[in-house]
């Protein structure tokens, strides 16, 4: 569990562990409320609750619920990439009535603390932070979507997020998973996204960031793409061997 279980306004974190957890259905139902457009990805949340699912060989996964005033109000899904020194933030979301109370930034802080614990568990001294894919406002289909995308980007920036200077395409799903049939995702398409690093205190002190390692960690180890995949090649076309 995170180092701090209680947060602003009486919020409390609960970790969902195991396919038989009584909280797993709660997490999936809340996921559908917060991210209705991603309903096809509920099996991914269920897989992450197992922490070391066979379809996620390179990650140690976490599913957290946020409870406030006896109501489930927030969800966090993220992973430590065991082959690297950083993690991947898949989902962070709150119900409308729980926003604007500091819960989002508190969840980010707890995520960074947990990733440090995970890093030590897997033989490293600390995590440098985690990667997150953020929608680009320029691609929004409506004014409401554009404003929502701008708010998400601003939130991650306020949490110290750095936009990495790479053209990033978000794959539809992790390659070769056993829990989602490709037919279920036939209407989904890869999306151009901002790729951001939310640095930990250790990561913020790094003089340089290894772009190749960060991109490889997400594309090769999380999404399980091949190194010669077009997404990988395009992202690194200007950065092979470079740091920032």
Region locations from a protein language model:
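Short beta-strand micro-motifs in enzyme catalytic cores
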Residues: 62-64, 85-87, 189-196
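Conserved acetyl-CoA-binding loop-helix of GNAT-fold acetyltransferases
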Residues: 94, 100-119
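Conserved beta-strand in the GNAT
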Residues: 65, 70-80, 88-93
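Alpha-helix termini
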Residues: 52-57, 113-125
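Feature marks short, surface-exposed loop/turn motifs that line or immediately flank catalytic pockets
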Residues: 82, 96-98, 138
